[in-house]
C-alpha cells in the first residue's frame, strides 16, 4: 500500500509521491528536484543544478501515473497528487534505451581517457548499459578543435548534453561555444576555431559529464585514483575560493573547485585552477643562501643562514636604530607569518611594515574592511555602482555574482578609468581619466546628499560644494537610493588610485546618503587578515609607498617581487640601496640574486599550514597539500628560528597552534581607519592608468605557463584614446616612446576607444614597464 500524502499543505507546496514515498515539494519544482531531495537516484547527463534546463539527453526519463509516455524528470514540473515511479519497468527500459543510444557513437577510450575513474558516463553505463553493443555500423568521428592552452578536446566522446554551451552562455556570459549541425552530425565548437578566452572557461571541464573536455596541462599525467584531494583555498584574490589540490607524491597535478555556496558556489576561476603550475619554476628557491665576503651568494645551512640574518638585522638596529629597518610583505602571506614578522620588526624597534605594495595613497590608514553586504548577497542587489572596479577580471567570481544580479534585473552603473569589457550591461558608465574620477564621484555624492539631506564631512565638504551635478549623476544616485540592497563596489583600481583616501571618503559619503552597502576589495589575497595581525605601519611607521620613496638601511622582503609593487624602479632602488637586504620567499630570480644578502626559501600557500581572512571576514584555515621543494621551510618556522636567534621571548613556542591562539581575537577585530584624505596634485600630460592584468597579479601566476599562453596574458602595450593616438603622431602597428619626465621606454601603441581622452593605459605587472612612474602620473607620449 502506498503512503498517503498529508492534507496539511502550505499554499506554496504540493503533495506528490515518489516510489511510494509521500512528500511535499515547492510548486514549480521539477521532478528531479523532488527525487534529489528524497535521495532517490535518477540518472542524468544534461541536467546541472546551476545551469538552465535543456532536457536534451533524456537519460532522466521517469514513469508518471496517467502520463502516456515517460517524461524527463529535469523538465517536468510537479503537480498536486502526482505519482512518480523511477524504478518501474517502463522507466528502467526507457533509461536503458537512452543509454544504448548515447553509447552508439562513443569511443572505447576509457583506458586512455583522463576522465576515466571519475566519469559520469562510465558510472551510469555500469548501471544502465548493455554488456555488448548491438550497433555494428561505423561510429561517428569528430575532428578535435584547439580551443586554447587550458582545455583539451576529444569531441568524438561528446554526447551533446550542451552543459558546456550553457555554462559559457549563462554563467561565463561569453557564448564562446555552440552546436553546429543537426542530429548525430551536431558538433560542439567555437564556430570559428578560436581559443576560449573567458576567465571562467576551465569550469566546462568540471561540468562535462564525459571526457570530451579535459584539463590540458594535466593531460595524461595521472589517473584519478592515484590522486589525493587536499582541501585548500585560492590565494590570488580576496575571495578565498574553496578548492581541492589533487596531489600525487606531494606534487600538485591539478586543482578543482570545492563547493561553498557562500564564497565560490561550485565554480573556480582559471587563475586559481591553473596557477599551481607556478609552484614548479626554474628559479624556485630551494636552499638558503648568504652573501660571502667575496660578494657572491653561496649555499648555506639553515643554522648559518639564520645566524647571518639575525646578526645583520641586529647590526643595522644598533648602528642606525630600528627605524632604519623595514619589511615589504606580499599579501598572499598567511596571518601567522604576518603576525610573526610584525613581532620580529617590533622587537627590533621598527614599525615600518606593509602588505599594500601597490597602494599609492594610504593617508587614511585604510587596510581593507570586510564587505558590508556579504558576497553571496550581491546577486540579490537591486542596484550596483562600480568605482574603479573590473570584477570580471580582478575577482572573477565576484564578477559572476554581479552578472547574476544583472540577470535578476539589477541596474549597474560605473565610474571607471577604462571602458572595461563586462559580461553584463551598465545603465550609465562614466569613463574618465583617474583624476577626473574624483569629480564624477563627487557629483554623484552631491546629488545623493542633496536628496537625502545628509551633511558632508569636513574632509570632503569642498569637493561636494564645488561638484558640478548633471542629470546622469542624479539618476545614478537615485538608482542607488531607490533600490533594495544596493551595493557600492570599491575595486582594485580605486584602492590603488593616487588619491584613494579622498575617493574612498566620497564613496563612503555616497553610500551613507543612499543607504548603500560599501564593499571594498582588500589588497591581495589576505589583506584583511594581514592588517588585523599588524602588517601595516604602526604609530609613526612607514607604509609601502614611503618605504619605496625613502629606502631604509635594512629591508626584508617577504614573497615580494618588483612587479608586485606600485613602481618596480623604486622597489629595485630600495633593495639595491639597502645595506642589508633579506629575501624570504619562494623565487630566487635574478633581481633577488643581485641585491639580496640572504635568501631564505619558504613555502607557498599550497605547501604550508596557514590562516586567511576573506572579504566577508570568514577565517579559513588550510593545511599543507604539497611537499616543500628542496630545503625550503614553512615561513612561520623560519621566523621562529630568527626570533630565537635575536633573543626575543615572544618566539618561545613550538607549534603553529600556539601562534593561532595568540591571533584568534585579532582576526575578528577590524583595523580602525582615520578620516584623513590626500590633497590631490594634478600632474600634466597624459595620465597613466595602471591596472593589474589578471594573469600578472602575483609571482606564482606569472610563472604558470598555461595561463601565460592565453590571450588574457598579452604583451605590454600603451593604449590611447583614438584622438590622443592621432595627436601623438602614432600609427597603427607602430611604437610609442613614453616618458614620465625621468625615464622613458618604448612600447607597442594601439588606439582604443575604451580609453578616455587625456589618459594612457599601461598595465602593471610587466618587467618592460618597470621604469615608469605609478598610477596617476603624467606621461609624455611621442612616436618612437
Where are these regions (language model features)?
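A generic structural motif
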Residues: 350-362, 409-419, 513-529, 578-589, ...
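Long hydrophobic segments that form regular secondary structure
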Residues: 249-266, 271-281, 285-292, 301, ...
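A glycine-rich phosphate-binding loop feature that marks nucleotide/adenosyl-phosphate handling sites
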Residues: 184-185, 221-228, 330-333, 361-362, ...
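A cross-kingdom feature strongest in bacterial/archaeal respiratory oxidoreductases
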Residues: 2, 42, 47, 342, ...
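A short, glycine/Asx- and small/polar-enriched loop/turn
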Residues: 53-58
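Active-site phosphate/pyrophosphate-binding segments
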Residues: 306, 424-550, 667
Amino acid at each position: 500500500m502506498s503512503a498517503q500524502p498529508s492534507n496539511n499543505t502550505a499554499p506554496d507546496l504540493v503533495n506528490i509521491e515518489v516510489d511510494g514515498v509521500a512528500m511535499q515539494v515547492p510548486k514549480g519544482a521539477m521532478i528531479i528536484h523532488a527525487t534529489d531531495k528524497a535521495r532517490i537516484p535518477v540518472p542524468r547527463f544534461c541536467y546541472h543544478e546551476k545551469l538552465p534546463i535543456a532536457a536534451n539527453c533524456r537519460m532522466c526519463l521517469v514513469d508518471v501515473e496517467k502520463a502516456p509516455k515517460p517524461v524527463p524528470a529535469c523538465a517536468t514540473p510537479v503537480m498536486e497528487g502526482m505519482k512518480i515511479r523511477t524504478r518501474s519497468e517502463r522507466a528502467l527500459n526507457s533509461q536503458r534505451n537512452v543509454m544504448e543510444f548515447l553509447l552508439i557513437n562513443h569511443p572505447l577510450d576509457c583506458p586512455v581517457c583522463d576522465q576515466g575513474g571519475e566519469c559520469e558516463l562510465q558510472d551510469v553505463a555500469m548501471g544502465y548499459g548493455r554488456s555488448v553493443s548491438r550497433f555494428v555500423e561505423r561510429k561517428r568521428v569528430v575532428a578535435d578543435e584547439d580551443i586554447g592552452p587550458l582545455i583539451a578536446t576529444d569531441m568524438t566522446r561528446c554526447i551533446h548534453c550542451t552543459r558546456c554551451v550553457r555554462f559559457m552562455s549563462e554563467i561565463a556570459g561569453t557564448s564562446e561555444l555552440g552546436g553546429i549541425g543537426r542530429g548525430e552530425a551536431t558538433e560542439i565548437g567555437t564556430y570559428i576555431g578560436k581559443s576560449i578566452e573567458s576567465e571562467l572557461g576551465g569550469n566546462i571541464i568540471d561540468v562535462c559529464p564525459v571526457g570530451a573536455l579535459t584539463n590540458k596541462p594535466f593531460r595524461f599525467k595521472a589517473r584519478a585514483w592515484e590522486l589525493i584531494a587536499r582541501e585548500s583555498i585560492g590565494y590570488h584574490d580576496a575571495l578565498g575560493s574553496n578548492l581541492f589540490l589533487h596531489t600525487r607524491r606531494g606534487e600538485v597535478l591539478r586543482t578543482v573547485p570545492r563547493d561553498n555556496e557562500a564564497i565560490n558556489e561550485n565554480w573556480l576561476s582559471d587563475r586559481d585552477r591553473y596557477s599551481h603550475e607556478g609552484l614548479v619554476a626554474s628559479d624556485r628557491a630551494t636552499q638558503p643562501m648568504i652573501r660571502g665576503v667575496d660578494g657572491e651568494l653561496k649555499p648555506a645551512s639553515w643554522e648559518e643562514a639564520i645566524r647571518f640574518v639575525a646578526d645583520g638585522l641586529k647590526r643595522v638596529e644598533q648602528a642606525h636604530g630600528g627605524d632604519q629597518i623595514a619589511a615589504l610583505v606580499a599579501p598572499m602571506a598567511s596571518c601567522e607569518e604576518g603576525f610573526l614578522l610584525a613581532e620580529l620588526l617590533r622587537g627590533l624597534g621598527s614599525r615600518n611594515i606593509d602588505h599594500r605594495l601597490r597602494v599609492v595613497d594610504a593617508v587614511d590608514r585604510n587596510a581593507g574592511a570586510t564587505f558590508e553586504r556579504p558576497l553571496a548577497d550581491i546577486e540579490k542587489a537591486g542596484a550596483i555602482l562600480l568605482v574603479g572596479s573590473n570584477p570580471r577580471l580582478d575577482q572573477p567570481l565576484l564578477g559572476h555574482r554581479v552578472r547574476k544580479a544583472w540577470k535578476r534585473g539589477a541596474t549597474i552603473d560605473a565610474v571607471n578609468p577604462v571602458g572595461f569589457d563586462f559580461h553584463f550591461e551598465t545603465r550609465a558608465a562614466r569613463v574618465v581619466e583617474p583624476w577626473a574620477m574624483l569629480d564624477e564621484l563627487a557629483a554623484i555624492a552631491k546629488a545623493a546628499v542633496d536628496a537625502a539631506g545628509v551633511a558632508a564631512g569636513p574632509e570632503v565638504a569642498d569637493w561636494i560644494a564645488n561638484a558640478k551635478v548633471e542629470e546622469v549623476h542624479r539618476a545614478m544616485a537615485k538608482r542607488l537610493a531607490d533600490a533594495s540592497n544596493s551595493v557600492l563596489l570599491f575595486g582594485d583600481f580605486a584602492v590603488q588610485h593616487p588619491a584613494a583616501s579622498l575617493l574612498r571618503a566620497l564613496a563612503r559619503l555616497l553610500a551613507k546618503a543612499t543607504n548603500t552597502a560599501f564593499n571594498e576589495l582588500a589588497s591581495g589575497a589576505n589583506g584583511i587578515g594581514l592588517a588585523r595581525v599588524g602588517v601595516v605601519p604602526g604609530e609613526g611607521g612607514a607604509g609601502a609607498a614611503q618605504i619605496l620613496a625613502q629606502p631604509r638601511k635594512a629591508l626584508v622582503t617577504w614573497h615580494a617581487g618588483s612587479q608586485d609593487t606600485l613602481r618596480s624602479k623604486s622597489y629595485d632602488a630600495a633593495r639595491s640601496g639597502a645595506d642589508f637586504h633579506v629575501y624570504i620567499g619562494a623565487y630566487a630570480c635574478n633581481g633577488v640574486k643581485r641585491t639580496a644578502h640572504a635568501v631564505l626559501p619558504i613555502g607557498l600557500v599550497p605547501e604550508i599550514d596557514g590562516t586567511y581572512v576573506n572579504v566577508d571576514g570568514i577565517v579559513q584555515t588550510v593545511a599543507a597539500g604539497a611537499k616543500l621543494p628542496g630545503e625550503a621551510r614553512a615561513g612561520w618556522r623560519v621566523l621562529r628560528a630568527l626570533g630565537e636567534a635575536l633573543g626575543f621571548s615572544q618566539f618561545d613556542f613550538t607549534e603553529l597552534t600556539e601562534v593561532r591562539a595568540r591571533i584568534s581575537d585579532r582576526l575578528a577585530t577590524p583595523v580602525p581607519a582615520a578620516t584623513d584624505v590626500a590633497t590631490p596634485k594634478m600632474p600634466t600630460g597624459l595620465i597613466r592608468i595602471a591596472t593589474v592584468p589578471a594573469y600578472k597579479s602575483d609571482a606564482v601566476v606569472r610563472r604558470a605557463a598555461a595561463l601565460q599562453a592565453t590571450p588574457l596574458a598579452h604583451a605590454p602595450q600603451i593604449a590611447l584614446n583614438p584622438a590622443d593616438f592621432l595627436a601623438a603622431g602614432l600609427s597603427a602597428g607602430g611604437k610609442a616612446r613614453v616618458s614620465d619626465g625621468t625615464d622613458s621606454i618604448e612600447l607597442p601603441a594601439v588606439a582604443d576607444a575604451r580609453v578616455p581622452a587625456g589618459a594612457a593605459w599601461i598595465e602593471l605587472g610587466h618587467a618592460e614597464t618597470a621604469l615608469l612612474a605609478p598610477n596617476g602620473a603624467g606621461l609624455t607620449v611621442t612616436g618612437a
